[in-house]
Each structure stands twice: as C-alpha cells, then as structure tokens.
UniProtKB/Swiss-Prot annotation:
<dbReference type="GO" id="GO:0005524">
    <property type="term" value="F:ATP binding"/>
</dbReference>
<dbReference type="GO" id="GO:0006412">
    <property type="term" value="P:translation"/>
</dbReference>
<feature type="active site" description="Charge relay system">
    <location>
        <position position="158"/>
    </location>
</feature>
<protein>
    <recommendedName>
        <fullName>Glutamyl-tRNA(Gln) amidotransferase subunit A</fullName>
        <ecNumber>6.3.5.7</ecNumber>
    </recommendedName>
</protein>
<dbReference type="InterPro" id="IPR023631">
    <property type="entry name" value="Amidase_dom"/>
</dbReference>
<comment type="subunit">
    <text>Heterotrimer of A, B and C subunits.</text>
</comment>
<dbReference type="InterPro" id="IPR000120">
    <property type="entry name" value="Amidase"/>
</dbReference>
<dbReference type="GO" id="GO:0050567">
    <property type="term" value="F:glutaminyl-tRNA synthase (glutamine-hydrolyzing) activity"/>
</dbReference>
<dbReference type="Pfam" id="PF01425">
    <property type="entry name" value="Amidase"/>
</dbReference>
<comment type="similarity">
    <text>Belongs to the amidase family. GatA subfamily.</text>
</comment>
<dbReference type="GO" id="GO:0030956">
    <property type="term" value="C:glutamyl-tRNA(Gln) amidotransferase complex"/>
</dbReference>
<keyword id="KW-0547">Nucleotide-binding</keyword>
<keyword id="KW-0436">Ligase</keyword>
<keyword id="KW-0648">Protein biosynthesis</keyword>
<feature type="active site" description="Acyl-ester intermediate">
    <location>
        <position position="182"/>
    </location>
</feature>
<dbReference type="InterPro" id="IPR020556">
    <property type="entry name" value="Amidase_CS"/>
</dbReference>
<comment type="function">
    <text>Allows the formation of correctly charged Gln-tRNA(Gln) through the transamidation of misacylated Glu-tRNA(Gln) in organisms which lack glutaminyl-tRNA synthetase. The reaction takes place in the presence of glutamine and ATP through an activated gamma-phospho-Glu-tRNA(Gln).</text>
</comment>
Length: 493
C-alpha cells in the first residue's frame, strides 16, 4: 500500500471521502515525514498541534457527511503568507518573532475549504532569489541529487521550501508566490507542477509584498490535477486587494480533461537563446510533438521584445521592493536594534535585519527611482513592459491559444555554485519566466523529463489572461505523455 504521505492530493481526497483512513492519520504521516526530513530544511516552522486539531475537525465533518472541498488535506504554507498566531518571517531576520493577528486571504480560503496546516515553508528572503540560498533561516536542500553524486542541489526559488516539501512528500501541496518565476522555476527544478495564475486571480491581501505589480500567489503540487484543485480554492475576488479581479472562479479540475484538439500552440523563436543546452532544446521539441500528436497545431511566433524583459524586470521589481520594504524600521514589529536616536535605530535595524541580496535590490531600486534616473530607467522599463504585453496580445489575436517554452535554462545547480558569481548569472534563471509576470499572464510549469544527470526538467505553458483552463488542459496532455516523474530513494530519511 502507498504510504499516506505519498498519495497525490486527489488520491488523498478520494481516500478520505471513502473513509480508507482518517484526516488525523494522514496529518500524522506528514508530520512524521517532516521530522525525518530536517536535513532538507524545507520548513521554517512546523505546526503539529494545529495540524492535528484541524484534522480532528475534518474527521468530524467527514463523519457527519459535511466534507468541504479540501477536507482533511495537509498543506504547507510559504512563509510569505500571514498566518494568524503563527510565526511569519518572509525568510528574513528583520521579521524575527512576528506573529500576525490576521490571516492572508489565500490561506483563509484553504482553511475555509477544510485543508490542514502543517507549517510554514522556507523561501529566499522576501522572495528575492532563485535558489533558496538567501533565507535567514538556512538554505533549503533539494530532495533530488545528480546520479552518482552526494553534492547538495538547490530547489530553486524563491518558493524553494514549497517545491522541496511537495517533491519530498512533506505535504500534499503548498502555497507559493511568483514575482518573476518563483513558482515555475522551483517546480521545474524539483519535478513538481506549479502555476502562476493571471495577475488578479488570487488576492495578495496578507501576503508580504516584494513587487506589488508583479506578485501573484499560486500552488505547487505533484500533479496537474492537484494544482487545479488547489487553485480552485485559492482564487477568488477579495475587495481588500484593489488588484483582485471580480470574476467567477472556473472549475479548473474539470478543465484538465478537455485535451488540446483544435488548439494552436505558439513556439516563440526569441526563446531559442544563445547557449541553450541541447537537452533543453530536445525537450522543448518533444513537448511540441506531444501536443501535436494530441491534436494541437504548432505554430512559430515572434515575441520581439523578449530580449528586454529581464533587464526591465530587474528595474521594475527592485524599484517596487525599495518602496515596499521601507516599512521595516524596527518600530512596530520584528527586529529592533537600538541606536543613539530614532534615525540610528532605523539604520541599525535595517543593517542587521536585511540580508545581502535584499540590500542589493533595495539599493538598485532606490537608485532607479532617484531624481535624474527615474525617467532614464524606471519610466523606460515600464514602457518596455507595455511593449512585452502587446507582443503577447498580438500573438493571441492571431489565433494562438497558448505558448510553449522551456521553464528554465538548465536543471538544478549545486548549493553554493552561484554564490560567488556575478548576481546577473543568478538572475538569468528567470530568463524564460519574467515575461509572464511583466505581462500579467498565467503560466504553468510541468515536469517533462530528466537531464543526462537524472535531474528534472520542466516545460512552461503561457496562456491568455484568465484562461488558466487551457493551460491545465495542455499541461495535462504533457503530463500524460511524459509520465509522472518519480523522486529517487529518500537519501535524507
């Protein structure tokens, strides 16, 4: 029999409904797995008491025939989401000891639907990073390893804890956020599925902000179906978030069986970047073949402003971050380092509380917003953002239903491999994903194969605004063709 923590979310839902096991049993199985996997450092804090109490409520609901959509399903929460009464840090020392008195909209909707909270998941500090190496609470280690090697690998970032926990069976699914690829890149690195919904599909209320015009919540899970189930509960209008869109939430799970017959899938020629590894190119071609064989038409398209996306993103995102992070001053919550006066306290607190990468991005953002540089950098980057959005609009107006690209330019790299490199080398991990955020579109990463060293590789599908259903249908087609990617033996247990 499959261990309870190794079930997919859909299988666990069906098993609980059939009373094959209890919510308490599956919660305990995951808590035991978390205890055995401390070496991965996927969780900043586990919440066993809360999990078991929530599971008991779920068992009572199931016994009465009152089960809700996610009844009794154990989930992990990225530590960027405010959770009432539970330590919430954004992976930063500056929020040490912070326990919110409120719950994020996304997590509250998961609890409304009966899900069980296992704990808070590790991440790059303030979601700034592509490797989960910048967390003040230690690096998260990927459960994957290269064949014949014990060298630790990164799980990707910033949602590295979410991706590692899902891949290692430490939760059935997890919340995550995506500002420039922080759901899709770690999902690709860990053989999991991650969707960044359309900007405005999920409320940002109660999520610690990085770059407000780019941030969007979404799920990471082990299958396309599991992601669809979770997004159905996470999405929805919230009047407390002015960017939240007031429109019905579709039945995402039903969409996975639609297939792709009659769809036109675009292949953007600009994504064939110089130096792309041959195995990434082969996988991309294979993905197009799978979709063609399932009845889709494959069409080469042009997204001419793609080359400007990454530099524009690394102007817009730090600019917004420098503004958002100005609120952390040691006065009302979190870390406080005394100074000779109030200005000294601000300076000392921020110097001690923020890590190196966060400081770098605050400084970049402050620079591009400063007098004399605002027009030259920030305004120009926003104009490029508009051009990128228009490129996608033109492709969709010409009849393209979704766009297929690689999710990442490589498989997972080793812990510390990029630590001393030029920061731009790390930023290049987002080369295939940032355009989606800049244009506010939905994008999904789905596992599609392994590289020569046995590490997962993912493909990305990009959709029309608020057409996540087509992405789920196409992603399910790829998942069916590629097969589920199984994690090798648990070396950490």
């Amino acid at each position: 029999m499959t261990a309870l923590n190794e079930l997919t979310l859909a299988e666990a839902r069906d098993g609980l409904k059939a009373k094959d096991f209890s919510a308490r049993e599956i919660a305990q199985a995951h808590l035991d797995a978390i205890d055995r996997a401390k070496a991965l450092n996927a969780y900043i804090v586990a919440t066993p008491d809360r999990a078991l109490k929530m599971a008991e409520v779920s068992d009572q609901k199931i016994a009465k025939g009152e089960a809700r959509p996610l009844e009794g399903l154990p989930l992990g929460i990225k530590d960027l989401f405010a959770t009432q009464g539970v330590h919430t840090t954004a992976g930063s020392k500056i929020l040490e000891g912070f326990e919110p008195h409120y719950e994020s909209n996304v997590s509250s909707q998961l609890w409304r639907d009966g899900a069980v909270m296992l704990g808070k998941l590790n991440l790059d500090e303030f979601a700034m990073g592509s490797s989960n190496e910048t967390s003040a609470y230690g690096k998260t280690i990927s459960p994957w390893r290269r064949q014949g090697s014990d060298a630790p690998l990164v799980p990707g970032g910033s949602s590295g804890g979410s991706a590692a926990a899902v891949a290692a069976h430490l939760c059935l699914g997890a919340t995550a956020t995506d500002t420039g690829g922080s759901i899709r890149q770690p999902a690709a690195f860990t053989g999991t599925v991650g969707i960044k919904p359309t900007y405005g599909r999920c409320s940002r209320w109660g999520i610690i902000a990085y770059a407000s015009s780019l941030d969007q919540a979404g799920p990471i899970a082990r299958t396309v179906q599991d992601c669809a189930i979770l997004l159905g509960s996470m999405a929805g209008h919230d009047p407390r978030d002015t960017t939240s869109v007031d429109m019905p939430v579709p039945d995402f799970e039903a969409a996975i069986s639609r297939g792709v017959k009659g769809l036109t899938i675009g292949i953007p020629k600009e994504y064939r970047v110089e130096g792309m590894p041959a195995e990434i190119q082969r996988l991309w071609d294979q993905g197009a073949d799978w979709l063609r064989e399932a009845g889709a038409t494959i069409k080469e398209i042009s997204l001419p402003h793609t080359q400007y996306a990454l530099p524009a993103y690394y102007i817009v995102a730090p600019a917004e971050a420098s503004s958002n992070l100005a609120r952390y001053d040691g006065v009302r919550y979190g870390l406080r380092v005394p100074g000779k006066d109030i200005a000294g306290m601000y300076e000392n607190t921020r110097a001690a509380g923020f890590g190196r990468e966060v400081k770098r991005r605050i400084m970049i953002g402050t620079y591009v917003l400063s007098a004399g540089y605002y027009d030259a950098y920030y305004v120009r980057a926003q104009k490029i953002r508009t051009l990128i959005k228009r490129d996608f609009e033109a492709a969709y107006a010409a009849g393209v239903d979704a766009i297929l690209t690689p999710a990442t330019p490589s498989a997972a790299f080793g812990i510390g491999e990029m630590a001393s490199a030029d920061p731009v080398e790390m930023y290049l991990n987002d080369v295939f994903t940032v355009t989606v955020n800049m244009a506010g579109l939905p994008g999904i990463s789905v596992p599609a194969g392994l590289d020569a060293q046995g590490l997962p590789l993912g493909l990305q599908l990009i959709g029309r605004p608020f057409d996540e259903e087509t992405l789920f249908a196409a992603a399910q087609t790829i998942e069916n063709a590629a097969g589920r990617i199984s994690l090798p033996k648990a070396w950490w247990a």
